[in-house]
Amino acid sequence: MALRLITAGESHGPGLTCVVEGLPAGLEIRPEDLNADMSRRQLGHGRGGRMKIERDTAEVTGGLRHGRTLGSPIAIQIANRDYENWRERMSPWPAAERIEEVHLPRPGHADLVGTQKFKQSDVRNILERASARETAARVAGGGLCKAFLRRLGVSVYSHVLQIASVRAPEPERALEPEDFASVDSSPVRCLDEQASRAMVREIDELRRANESLGGVFEVQAFGLVPGLGSHVSWEERLDGRLAMAICSIQAVKGFAVGEAFAIAGRPGSEAHDEIFYTSERGIYRETNRAGGLEGGMTDGCPLIVRGAMKPLSTLTKPLRSIDIATLEPAEALRERTDSCTVPAAGVVGEAMVAVVLAAAFRRKFGGDHIDDVLEAVAAYEQRIEWRR
């Protein structure tokens, strides 16, 4: 059983569309399953004026009836309120008068390569779809997948580890779901209060210097059974699918599972998670350096992945570029932008991890109705004598 998510829409167009195909019938969905995370995506110190305009809400237009999935594709619409200010420039149909083209690509953005690839003279034909505004639709679809995972006892959370030069200290113990209860009360979604305050100062200082900021976020998933994913082919390895999902988020340039970069410099005896067994606990590990993945499969430990995000490509003091119509030197396009979206990227990361995990459950356990899935998972847990 395949599960997939597809989005459509442009940053300043009429709206965004998300379609999720492959969820079982009978799954209960509430409006807050979609809208809570969409609101969280708009949080974070360093967001720009666009977030004062948009108040994202999801309108389900297919696949649900009376709050339960039908087993058919689920379609979601998210309106762009800012479209009223862009109606002529972004109308799906020919405009009544000539619309001025944009010819100033931004270094680091899809602008230049996109115009080359798709034979476009107007950079706006590329930047509108390449914009991170598209992630609002992904978060809505991720909300559906999170609801599915919750029925299976799986929860997904995120937090910010670094913004620019400020890095939070590594936790002294393994995090638990309850540790994330107040993460959204931090203006940068950081679990360490001192680091959170330093991150806010860093954003303020660099924003005054007309700079944008990147950073690192972490996503953790709890309650996973061993054996999601597979070792038998490269395309079935779950770490590869997660890498694609996280690196598909706009501006993300790096990915890690568990302590990947730290253990690269350690000897093998300090890199792996030893295996133990007791009659009370069953099979267990005392460490989780592998981040919950071994051989492309979940190993039953919490899944831990990280994404490294570069500073945003749109700067309030534009970088040097060219005019693609004249090839003359010019300043890059100055578009309305955020200073820092690392906190929001963590929420998007949750959605993408949820999509990958939901797809892995569907691939392994199938089932046309949610009850079929629950029975299949329970039978598997009994077969491997798994204890959560």
Please report, for each region that a protein language model flagged, where it lies by residue:
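Generic N-terminal targeting/processing segments that precede catalytic cores or assembly contacts
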Residues: 1-388
